Amino acid sequence: MNINATIFGQTIAFFLFVFFCMKYIWPNLISLVEKRRENIAQALNEAKQAKLNLKISKEKAKKRIESAQIKCKNIINEANETKKLLIEEAKKEAIKIKEHIISQGRLDILDEKKRMCEDLKTKISEIIVMSVEKIIESSINKKISDNIIERSISKINKIKG
């Protein structure tokens, strides 16, 4: 066997093999590699987009939390203001009730004072009448007795009037 013919045959077989591979196998491998490259590029883009979406979502969540905190503070402030108003109204109402009770008590005291004065005048007049009667009964001089009676009656009239 001739080495040149063998090498030449192997070279032809190699070129046929390379041609066959380039014609039928290589395009499939290249298309698989391209599809894989596209899938990887698409996955990387999706990952970048997901990162961006996550960042945006975090910012939105932060803004919502801040908004909720502001709303909570506003609600608390409104509740405090309402509480203050209710307390003020309750104080005013309590003061009105207190003043009403005090004025009613004063009126009751004045009424009681008037009633007691009337009772006292009545009792004094009764005592005076009784003492005058006793004086008259024990008195000998009618003129003196009449004078005493007239003074007593005038004093009683002054007390009543």
Swiss-Prot record:
The chain crosses the membrane at residues 12-32. Signal peptide: none annotated. This is ATP synthase subunit b. Pfam families: ATP-synt_B (PF00430). F(1)F(0) ATP synthase produces ATP from ADP in the presence of a proton or sodium gradient. F-type ATPases consist of two structural domains, F(1) containing the extramembraneous catalytic core and F(0) containing the membrane proton channel, linked together by a central stalk and a peripheral stalk. During catalysis, ATP synthesis in the catalytic domain of F(1) is coupled via a rotary mechanism of the central stalk subunits to proton translocation. It is found in: Cell membrane. Its main location: membrane. Belongs to the ATPase B chain family. One of its GO terms (molecular function) is proton-transporting ATP synthase activity, rotational mechanism. The keyword Membrane applies. One of its GO terms (cellular component) is proton-transporting ATP synthase complex. It is a single-pass membrane protein. F-type ATPases have 2 components, F(1) - the catalytic core - and F(0) - the membrane proton channel. F(1) has five subunits: alpha(3), beta(3), gamma(1), delta(1), epsilon(1). F(0) has three main subunits: a(1), b(2) and c(10-14). The alpha and beta chains form an alternating ring which encloses part of the gamma chain. F(1) is attached to F(0) by a central stalk formed by the gamma and epsilon chains, while a peripheral stalk is formed by the delta and b chains. Keywords: ATP synthesis, Cell membrane, CF(0), Hydrogen ion transport, Ion transport, Membrane, Transmembrane, Transmembrane helix, Transport. InterPro entries: ATP_synth_B-like_membr_sf (IPR028987), ATP_synth_b/b'su_bac/chlpt (IPR002146), ATP_synth_F0_bsu_bac (IPR005864), ATP_synthase_B_chain (IPR050059).
